[in-house]
From Swiss-Prot:
InterPro entries per record: AB_hydrolase_fold, NDRG
Family matches, as Pfam families: Ndr (PF03096)
Superkingdom of origin organism: Eukaryota
Family classification: Belongs to the NDRG family.
PANTHER family, per database record: N-MYC DOWNSTREAM REGULATED
Protein name: NDRG-like protein
UniProt xrefs under SUPFAM superfamilies: alpha/beta-Hydrolases
Length: 326
């Protein structure tokens, strides 16, 4: 088991530029797909690298609460230091149910649980004819991808979990969150749901370190159907516990990423201790909260590249990139 503490922590990130969009997809390089699953429709966005290699690795991302794939992952994938490897990747972003722009409200009785969302990933793989993939999950999205990897271990060769607390809440935390959540008037006052998310997940760090990014998250959150946003939070709070023996049994390579200023840092470090020490690594990013992919994307680009190389991908990239440098 290894731990990476950022040696480039003194490097200052340039301001994050996340385009707040008011239409379905603002990236012309992404293609929108609708996948029918057992529990309803999933909207996915695919970005295929220009290399077109038959061995091109597939990255499947799943975003955190209150976000969509644009807010959560575009600062990372659009970072200048990622330009050299994007041609070598097949990226599929899964939007949580009903989190695409202009989505219809999903009735609470039909909104899937975290376990059901994990099961529905198999429909995405079948649709895109993907056999194996590397999962990139932020927060709740990491829980979903981890649960899927327990169900279908042969399909997952690597997991990058960013700020993800996999274990369910303790009884006391569950009651506290449940009381707070059930008092939110989701239908009459959608701002209550958004305020809950901002206060509990992002404001503690971003108000001081990156207020512009916090404003972007708030504006983007308004574009998500408020009832579906509430349902996603509700499913996360009520998620089934993943047992310690299930976590230890994970056979894929795992990179756990946590911001050192995150409220949940200790929980994530405790989670790291439960992974198999032979295939897990933790990366602690200084001066950063829970949303590392947006706050400090440049700090995780190189560890991500090395992680991919360690599981046998991007070897052509390294060879060609080294040749170009020479």
């Amino acid at each position: 088991m290894s731990s990476l503490n950022k040696s480039i922590g003194s490097v200052t990130e340039s301001p994050i530029n996340v385009v707040v969009h008011n239409y379905d997809n603002n990236d012309p390089t992404e293609t929108r797909h609708e996948v029918q699953t057992k529990h309803g429709k999933l909207v996915c966005f695919q970005k295929i690298g220009s290399n077109q290699s038959p061995n091109m690795p597939t990255i499947i991302s799943y975003h955190d609460l209150g976000l969509n794939h644009t807010t959560c992952f575009s600062p990372f994938f659009n970072h200048p230091n990622m330009n050299h490897i994007l041609p070598y990747l097949n990226i599929i972003h899964i939007e949580a149910p009903g989190h695409e722009f202009n989505a219809e409200t999903i009735p609470s009785s039909q909104y899937p649980s975290i376990t059901e969302m994990a099961e529905d990933i198999q429909y995405v793989l079948d649709y895109f004819k993907v056999k194996v993939f590397i999962g990139l999950g932020a927060g709740a999205g990491g829980c979903i991808l981890t649960q899927y990897s327990i169900f279908y271990p042969r399909s997952v060769v690597g997991l990058v979990l960013v700020g993800s607390v996999i274990k369910s809440f303790s009884w006391l935390d569950w009651v506290k969150s449940w009381v707070e959540l059930t008092t939110l008037p989701s239908l009459k006052n959608p701002t209550g749901v958004r305020k809950y998310l901002i206060d509990h997940y992002y404001a503690d760090n971003l108000e001081e370190t990156n207020p512009d990014l916090l404003e972007i998250i708030k504006k983007e959150m308004v574009l998500i159907n408020p009832d579906n946003l509430y349902h996603y939070v509700h499913s996360f709070v009520k998620r089934d516990d993943i047992k310690e023996e299930q976590i230890k049994a994970l056979g894929c390579k795992i990179l756990l990423v946590v911001g050192k200023d995150s409220t949940y840092k200790e929980d994530i470090i405790d989670l790291f201790s439960q992974f198999n020490p032979r295939n897990s690594t933790i990366l602690q990013v200084p001066d950063c909260g829970i949303l590392v992919t947006a706050e400090k994307p440049g700090d995780i680009v190189e560890p991500f590249k090395l992680f991919m190389q360690g599981i046998g991908f991007l070897l052509d990239y390294y060879q060609s990139h080294d040749d170009a440098q020479k």
